[in-house]
Regions:
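Helix-loop boundary and gating motifs at the non-cytosolic
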Residues: 2-54, 196-241
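C-terminal transmembrane helical hairpin of 12-TM major facilitator-type secondary transporters
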Residues: 263-300
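Symmetry-related core transmembrane helices of the 12-TM Major Facilitator Superfamily/SLC fold
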Residues: 163-181
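Cytoplasmic helix-loop-helix junction between adjacent transmembrane helices
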Residues: 104-141
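Conserved MFS/SLC helix-loop-helix module at the cytosolic interface between two early adjacent transmembrane helices
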Residues: 57-93
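Helix-to-loop junctions at the C-terminal end of transmembrane segments
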Residues: 57-71, 156, 247-261
Length: 301
């Protein structure tokens, strides 16, 4: 269990576990709640697209903040800005000013958080234990992803959006606390050769962004509609997927640390391709539940 000896990574994983509880209990309901709140299906996709455009436009500010402050303060700021989106989400009723505010805040929060979080985790982690540290994080994420959707679905059904998303915002805010005890990481003023070295990563991110629209956002909406727009049933389906993902993540991490990263990646893309095609053929509730659970396996890979 040497991979658990890095205190900084453990604190970061604790933060990410709390963050993931907010994501699975609130963020996973983002698109489907918009649909339920009177935003038409085409406009839901337009809202998601607007957030992505905002993220693209705001991304250069990461370098400004990162160079001035280091990574940790930017991750903390991103965590707090992300928390602000949930109360806004609860106020949306169709195409209104709250939807516009939601798109702006979500774009800012996601830009601040995700770019710096991944860099921060990579900087604090140990190269020789990378696979185990990532798989331990993902196992924790999968575990809270079992509880989060159940609580989110129950809260939206029985307490209403204000209370449910308010609770999610509180959890997201508290997720910043472990970061206060984590070390800061400075950003180099210049990085010669960085663009050339990142070409493959750039290509992977482009393809990842392309498939995410249908594989994640589109599927969430399809699943929600197949489940007759029930927040409780939708949350239960996500919880089932969390169980599968928790078991699959640990196996993958072991393969990576044994030097089989390329094999794991090949297997991941093969499973992903087959699974994506199967999703397009989904027409019944049992089939949707099974494929959604298997999707956690593909996601872990």
């Amino acid at each position: 269990m040497a991979f658990l000896g890095n205190k900084s990574v453990n604190l970061l994983n604790l933060h990410y576990g709390m963050h993931s509880l907010a994501v699975s209990g609130g963020g996973a309901f983002f698109a489907v709640y918009l649909l339920k709140a009177g935003v038409s299906l085409p406009l839901v996709f337009c809202a998601i697209a607007a957030i992505m455009v905002g993220r693209f436009c705001l991304r250069p500010m990461i370098l400004i903040f990162g160079k001035a402050w280091g990574l940790r303060p930017v991750v903390i700021l991103g965590t707090l800005v992300q928390a602000m989106q949930y109360p806004l989400l609860a106020q949306v009723h169709g195409l209104d000013i709250w939807l516009l505010a939601l798109c702006l805040v979500s774009a800012a929060g996601d830009t601040l958080y995700w770019t710096t979080y991944h860099a921060y985790f990579a900087a604090l982690g140990d190269a020789e234990h990378r696979g185990h540290q990532v798989s331990a994080r993902e196992a924790l994420v999968s575990a809270v992803s079992i509880v989060g959707p159940i609580l989110g679905g129950w809260g939206l059904t029985h307490l209403g959006p204000l209370a449910a998303f308010g609770g999610v915002a509180l959890v997201q805010t508290l997720a910043a606390l472990p970061l206060l005890a984590s070390p800061n990481v400075a950003i180099a003023r210049t990085a010669p050769g960085a663009i050339r070295a990142s070409r493959m990563g750039f290509a992977i991110c482009v393809t990842d962004g392309w498939v995410s629209a249908g594989y994640y956002v589109g599927w969430q909406l399809v699943l929600f509609l197949i489940l007759k727009e029930s927040f409780t049933a939708y949350g239960g389906a996500l919880a089932l997927a969390g169980i599968v993902g928790a078991m699959a993540g640990l196996v993958l991490g072991k393969l990576v640390d044994l030097g089989h990263g390329a094999k794991a990646a090949t297997l991941a893309f093969a499973v992903f391709a087959v699974y994506t095609i199967a999703r397009g053929l989904t027409v019944t509730v049992p089939m949707a539940l099974i494929l959604n659970a298997l999707g956690a396996l593909a996601g872990s890979l």
